[in-house]
Amino acid sequence: MTPLLAARGVSRRYGDREVLAPCDLELRAGELVALVGPNGSGKSTLLSVLAGALDPSGGQVERSATVGWAPQRPALYGRLTPRENLRLFARLEGHPAAAELDLPETPTVTHSVGMRQRLNLALAFLGEPRVLLLDEPTASLDPAQRALLWERLARVREAGGAVCFATQNVEERERADRTLELLDGRLLP
């Protein structure tokens, strides 16, 4: 079966510093994959390269499905309301109008970190991508929002999608079908 996303010899350098050693990985339909490692191990860099937000210094990423990405630091327009952010990103990405969600009508910059994370995740789900790349997706969510996210991710998996999420949380890691571990920019066997 063709993977939904595959990295072949993907690496990333900043000048002379290698932050991600060449690595290979595949995300297949129906998979929930945890990406773990200490702070600074390269998890965010790897997810950014897989999503196409950063170009790899070497290797290539093959995507046979649409990809949604929720970075650890969301790129939101603070002066826009959450609804305006959703509509803007939907237009930029060529998706139909974003679903009407129960969102506050105040500028995003005035919202809590948890509320901004909810918006960040809503942006990742725009267009119903088959692959989701989520960087510490539950870090700022309250327990009720965490439970809703895990329910939604289970539906993505059941529909034949793939999810790769970075986490430091042992309980979340246990939800995964498999775990990828990074240490000092190297994907461990």
Give names to the regions the model predicted.
Residues 132-136:
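Catalytic Walker B motif of ABC-type/P-loop ATPase nucleotide-binding domains
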